Amino acid sequence: MDKNKIIIFDTTLRDGEQSPGASMNTAEKLQIALQLERLGVDVMEAGFAAASPGDFDAVNQIAKQASNITVCSLARAVERDIKAAGEALAPAKNKRIHTFIATSPIHMQYKLKMSPDEVIRCAVEAVQYSKTFCDDVEFSCEDACRSEMSFLKEICEAAINAGAKTINIPDTVGYLYPEEITARISEIVKFIGDRAVVSVHNHNDLGMATANSLAAIKAGARQVEGTINGIGERAGNAALEEIVMAIKTRQDVFAPLYTGIISKEIYPTSRLIASITGIEPQPNKAIVGKNAFAHESGIHQDGVLKHKETYEIISAESIGLEKNSLVLGKHSGRHAFKDKLASLGFDLDSDALNKAFEKFKDLADKKKEIFDDDIRALVAEEITKIPQAYEITDLLQSSGGSLASASMSIRHNDEIVSDSALGNGTADAIFKVVDRISGINGTLKDYKVTAVSQGKDALAKVDVKVEFEGKTAVMGHGLDIDTMMASAKAYVGALNSYLRIHKN
């Protein structure tokens, strides 16, 4: 093993999916997985195979298609979880089972209701059983950063003796600050030595996930876990793009340490994940935020124009952020379209390619200029599509005075159903029509409109979160030049997601 290489462990498809509204289907996860492979990620946590049949299928499909990356599944320290992980990962060329159990006093007492000795025994049995499926086993001490050091050492020793090759020390609740994690990881690294790779997994509850990850690397950790765009539960995970670019940019601090990440794939990966999940990075997000390379101040603008390095410590080109150039038009053919998709990181089967191309030609008839972001949005809409129980065939809308009206026709069970409604605004009227036609009442929890590219004829992307029949809220996404049609598509998309999850 190269002791200077930092192993990049991406958990966007597992921990990142736990962001509210970020649920992904198998086709979406597969597209992200293939892009993570192009990015140069070392280990990809493809999911939690035991969580549901959908998760099992996603892990299994990724295991079949990934080739130059280690595919990993999370598993609690219970036989059922480990068996599911092992079976889902079976086709993978390189595979890893990541098993875990909580080790902090509060978790052992109140969540597990187990004694420390029982927790150690459970950990050992989990690692040993995992080894029957694959040689590469990672063991995590959940809530390690609130665990007693003496117990951490004891359970890590037991896991290594049982066959674990990686020991992960997560700050599950994002509690520590850099000096604390430096001290803790230094002691663990000194104790473990060369017997296993020490890994860290930091959450961002106090805004220190990236700083803590970098501090842990300096303290001797050689694997770092995180997500693209920093998505994840609560305040999210350590943002891998920040960690990678910090190591690359500050070689005066980190040399001879390095990662195998292909930095020009960072921005395409970020955009793909944002398009699929509907979760946009905050505008001032480091590395991938839309303002990351924007300069408003006149003094800054003057400096950048004279010499970029006056105010830019990394270049936009180094992360693959090229000018959002005009790319294709209505006379472009299928081959040119396919080549453009490949350059943007998409790998579609022939059926999906044909459908995406039809949408592109339709857009080209309506929109004078088509940009990379338009293409990304079109394809993301196609690969995120689920079975359509309800499908819009026509929409008429009007507004003026105190109320707006909407008339809509929707295909359901091979029949066209039409209805109308009034509302406090056009979007409200549209949502009421959908409720009337479907007979399923929804409560709008969130509504967001984004311009995909530039110009007066820019595509509108609408993301909604809707709670149907008092059940868990689901997300819907819509794309159209007409903002209200995009809103209708998003709401109907949420309805279809609800039916797929709760009715089937």
Swiss-Prot record:
Entry binding sites for Mn(2+):
D15, H201, H203, N237
Q: Which GO terms describe its biological process?
A: L-leucine biosynthetic process
Name of the protein in its database record: 2-isopropylmalate synthase
Q: Where is this region: Regulatory domain?
A: 391-504
Primary role:
Catalyzes the condensation of the acetyl group of acetyl-CoA with 3-methyl-2-oxobutanoate (2-ketoisovalerate) to form 3-carboxy-3-hydroxy-4-methylpentanoate (2-isopropylmalate).
PROSITE patterns assigned: AIPM_HOMOCIT_SYNTH_1, AIPM_HOMOCIT_SYNTH_2, PYR_CT
Q: Which GO terms describe its cellular component?
A: cytoplasm
Keywords attached to this entry? Amino-acid biosynthesis, Branched-chain amino acid biosynthesis, Cytoplasm, Leucine biosynthesis, Manganese, Metal-binding, Transferase
Query: What Enzyme Commission number does this protein have?
Result: 2.3.3.13
CDD domains, per this entry?
Answer: DRE_TIM_IPMS
Q: Name one GO molecular function term.
A: manganese ion binding
Identify the InterPro entries for this entry: 2-IPM_HCS-like, 2-isopropylmalate_synth_dimer, AIPM/Hcit_synth_CS, Aldolase_TIM, LeuA/HCS_post-cat, LeuA_allosteric_dom_sf, LeuA_bact_synth, PYR_CT
On subunit structure and binding partners, the annotation says: Homodimer.
From which source organism is this entry? Campylobacter concisus (strain 13826)
